[in-house]
């Protein structure tokens, strides 16, 4: 999928546009988090997070792409000398329905759970020195004993300062590099290869359609991106245009796309994942249980899942998106700034454009 077209001009536009879209002093109605996250240093770059339900209602919290996830996902942001250290782990797209009970943690009011993880595993801290670690975002929830995501809660942590031993951190980061150098698949064959190739191929016209709809603005755009501002519309359209270019070829481009999981990341609840630092995308077995294109508004399918993953990779359009919220209800609760940085906002908007939702 290596595209011959340079995206330097787009990158420059994106950086400038994102910086000007939302004032840094923007306030949200939900500034008080339902989940409190207490970060403490265990040893070296090993960190403990204690997640507590601050509210007065029971919560059933999804652990995928959150604390307690065993995959190398982004749980915290790491800052060095005032700048965020690039995240080098994986970004997962998981199911929004049919989820297994074991991926949820139930928290009653005042109850907590703990998680320990090494921040040097997914961030290059080899330069050493003082870093600041913090977490803020949204966690997906479902009704108690449910298997379909139905809500979202805001979480926020304290700021944790750590003095890092660069040599020790480099060894931890090297373990991720070793993890990422396992034998790769040489290609896509059989029914899965055909399904993936078709989905990638059809991602191109759908992304182009979404780009046109974004430029025109309207109800669906405002629903997902919380504004009809022309600058924001152009920025969203530019990312969709880049996805359309990347998906237009399965033999050249800026990303490497695998039909199956070469790194052992997949689980029954994960559809696909991206390794943005290497511009790698991989489907999971659950991807192939999806329909090619759904006829259900806000639903998941193979084509929009591929679009979701393409938006993560900075080789397609920089900066790549994050995973801030999953599903229609959570994605439409985001601010403009957050939606511009949320992969599911793009895939759900493409679904809305295709079906006229």
Curated annotation (Swiss-Prot):
Gene3D superfamilies: 2.60.40.2970, Collagenase (Catalytic Domain). One of its GO terms (biological process) is proteolysis. Its main location: secreted. Zn(2+) binds at residues 308, 312, 323. It is found in: Secreted. Binds 1 zinc ion per subunit. Residues 20-182 form a propeptide. GO terms for cellular component: extracellular region. InterPro entries: Fungal_M35_metalloproteases (IPR050414), MetalloPept_cat_dom_sf (IPR024079), Peptidase_M35 (IPR001384). Secreted metalloproteinase that allows assimilation of proteinaceous substrates. Shows high activities on basic nuclear substrates such as histone and protamine. Belongs to the peptidase M35 family. This is Neutral protease 2 homolog BDBG_03102. It comes from Blastomyces gilchristii (strain SLH14081) (Blastomyces dermatitidis).
């Amino acid at each position: 999928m290596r595209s011959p077209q340079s995206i330097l001009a787009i990158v420059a536009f994106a950086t400038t546009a994102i910086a000007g879209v939302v004032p840094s002093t923007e306030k949200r109605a939900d500034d008080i988090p339902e989940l409190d996250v207490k970060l403490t240093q265990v040893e070296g770059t090993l960190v403990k997070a204690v997640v507590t339900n601050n509210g007065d209602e029971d919560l059933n919290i999804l652990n995928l792409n959150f604390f307690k996830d065993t995959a190398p996902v982004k749980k915290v942001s790491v800052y060095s000398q005032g700048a965020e250290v690039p995240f080098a782990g994986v970004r997962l797209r998981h199911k929004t329905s049919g989820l297994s009970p074991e991926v949820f943690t139930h928290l009653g009011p005042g109850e907590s759970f703990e998680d320990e993880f090494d921040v040097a595993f997914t961030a290059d801290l080899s330069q050493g020195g003082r870093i600041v670690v913090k977490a803020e975002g949204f966690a997906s929830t479902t009704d108690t004993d449910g298997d379909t995501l139905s809500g979202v809660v805001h979480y926020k942590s304290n700021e944790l300062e750590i003095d890092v031993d660069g040599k020790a951190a480099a060894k931890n980061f090297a373990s991720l590099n070793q993890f990422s150098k396992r034998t790769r698949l040489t290609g896509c064959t059989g029914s899965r290869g055909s399904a993936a190739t078709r989905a990638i191929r059809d991602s191109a016209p759908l992304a182009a359609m979404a780009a046109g709809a974004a430029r025109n603005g309207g109800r669906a755009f405002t629903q997902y991106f919380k504004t009809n501002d022309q600058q924001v519309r152009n920025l969203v359209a530019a990312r969709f245009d880049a996805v359309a270019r990347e998906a237009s070829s399965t033999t050249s481009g800026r990303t490497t796309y695998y039909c199956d999981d070469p790194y052992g990341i997949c689980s029954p609840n994960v559809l696909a994942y991206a390794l943005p630092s290497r511009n790698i995308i991989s489907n999971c077995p659950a991807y192939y249980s999806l329909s090619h294109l759904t006829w259900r508004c806000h639903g998941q399918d193979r084509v929009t899942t591929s679009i979701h993953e393409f938006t993560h990779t900075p080789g397609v359009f920089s900066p790549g998106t994050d995973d801030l919220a999953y599903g229609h209800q959570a994605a439409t609760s985001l601010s403009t700034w957050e939606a511009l940085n949320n992969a599911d906002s793009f895939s759900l908007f493409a679904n809305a454009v295709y079906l006229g939702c």
